[in-house]
């Protein structure tokens, strides 16, 4: 974990500080989500972006077809960037809630707003790169520390069941 003494010097040098990208290698962000959760959540998100933020539509398509992305909903960034991101994000999420709700989903799957926000953070950030708002040289990636550990056997087994037998995730690992 990063300490205050380690972080403070980075704040002047970097506009955005993130956990290292998660790499899926054999799947795109969209296909991984489709196998492990419910793809209609991303499809409706795409519709909302096309309606409310059409200038982000191509970036959305580009991002969901990548095999890596910034996950975990963790970021440190300049206040003006964070304000812009949150305004954009919550406008989309509140509309997503209106359209989908959480009925008929178990408690684990009801957390899909957080999962969708992980993916669309990458859309927002990529668009900031494209528009020259954020310089990639002023982005810092830091290693991820799992304080609770990860059961890789259960995680791997659940992934294979999702990919080959359409068994959606039921919990975290």
Please annotate each region the language model reported.
Residues 1-173:
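ER/Golgi luminal nucleotide-sugar-dependent glycosyltransferases, focusing on the catalytic module
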């Amino acid at each position: 974990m990063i300490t205050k003494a380690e972080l403070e010097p980075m704040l002047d040098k970097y506009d955005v500080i993130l956990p290292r990208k998660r790499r899926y290698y054999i799947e795109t962000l969209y296909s991984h989500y489709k196998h492990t959760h419910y793809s209609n959540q991303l499809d409706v998100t795409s519709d909302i972006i096309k309606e409310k933020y059409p200038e982000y539509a191509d970036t959305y398509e580009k991002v969901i077809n990548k095999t890596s992305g910034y996950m975990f909903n963790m970021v440190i960034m300049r206040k003006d960037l964070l304000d812009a991101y949150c305004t954009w994000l919550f406008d989309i999420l509140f509309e997503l809630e209106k359209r989908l709700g959480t009925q008929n989903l178990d408690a684990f799957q009801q957390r899909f707003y957080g999962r969708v926000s992980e993916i669309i953070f990458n859309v927002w950030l990529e668009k900031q790169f494209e528009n020259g708002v954020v310089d990639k040289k002023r982005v810092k990636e830091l290693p991820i520390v799992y304080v609770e550990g990860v059961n890789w056997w259960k995680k791997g087994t659940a992934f294979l069941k999702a990919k080959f037998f359409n068994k959606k995730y039921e919990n975290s690992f």
